């Protein structure tokens, strides 16, 4: 009996050892084939560019007193500039009279004072009136479609201006620049205080204006 009992116990012990060895082998195999998990974090950098707001000279900075306007707008891309004004708006008109003549209200683009600039609320772009002590004394044109009564304007050459008006043109070179002012001086004594000015880059006209002295010959905003 004892022999049989020892045989059974020995067999059981061997079986247990073999089973434990199998478990260890399985664990070693798991560790060998387990792939480490790597987590990659992507950092995103957002760059914000500051927005700079530039106040344009043609941006309204206020309003003029309310005025009743009757009729249609009279200024358009076919308007013509002359020594005395722009179509129905003539130099010497009060602000109210000029707005009524233009068929639209004006809005200041520089602070109101004894001298300020204003643009029409309706009509073509590129028109700026100079208001001096409540009267219109000058108009600047930066619209290539608006031309003189002779049909010249922005984009035309200095040569054409000189050929067309001859001795009535006085040329001034702006300091430290290749730009020039070609100034039309009327021969009629009744227009002696008026001028039409063509500004060039040295070759072609880039801007024009007209008005009364002394404001018409100013190169800086009043």
Language-model region placement:
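Positively charged n-region of N-terminal signal peptides that target proteins for export
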Residues: 1-4
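Hydrophobic single-pass membrane-insertion segments
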Residues: 18-32
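Short acidic N-proximal helix/loop "leader" segments that mark the beginning
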Residues: 60-80
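A cross-family detector of function-defining hotspots
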Residues: 30, 93-132, 158-204, 210-213, ...
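Hydrophobic alpha-helical membrane-insertion segments, chiefly the h-region
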Residues: 7, 11-22
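Extracellular mucin-like PTS domains
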Residues: 36-63
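Second-shell loop/turn segments in exported
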Residues: 82-89, 145-152
């Amino acid at each position: 009996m004892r022999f049989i009992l020892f045989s059974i116990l020995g067999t059981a012990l061997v079986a247990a050892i073999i089973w434990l060895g199998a478990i260890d082998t399985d664990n070693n195999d798991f560790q060998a084939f387990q792939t480490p998990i790597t987590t990659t974090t992507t950092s995103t950098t957002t760059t914000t560019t500051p927005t700079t707001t530039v106040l344009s000279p043609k941006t309204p900075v206020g309003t003029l007193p309310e005025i009743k306007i009757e009729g249609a707008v009279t200024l358009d891309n076919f308007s013509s500039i002359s020594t005395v004004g722009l179509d129905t708006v003539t130099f010497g008109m009060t602000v109210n009279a000029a707005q009524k003549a233009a068929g639209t209200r004006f809005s200041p683009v520089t602070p109101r004072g004894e001298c300020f600039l204003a643009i029409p609320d309706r009509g073509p772009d590129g028109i700026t009136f100079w208001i001096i002590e409540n009267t219109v004394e000058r108009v600047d044109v930066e619209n290539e479609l608006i031309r003189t009564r002779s049909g010249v304007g922005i984009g035309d050459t200095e040569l054409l201006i000189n050929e067309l008006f001859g001795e009535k043109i006085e040329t001034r070179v702006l300091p430290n620049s290749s730009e020039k002012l070609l100034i039309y001086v009327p021969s009629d004594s009744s227009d002696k205080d008026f001028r039409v000015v063509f500004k060039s880059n040295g070759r072609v006209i880039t801007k024009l204006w007209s008005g009364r002295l002394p404001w018409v010959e100013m190169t800086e905003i009043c």
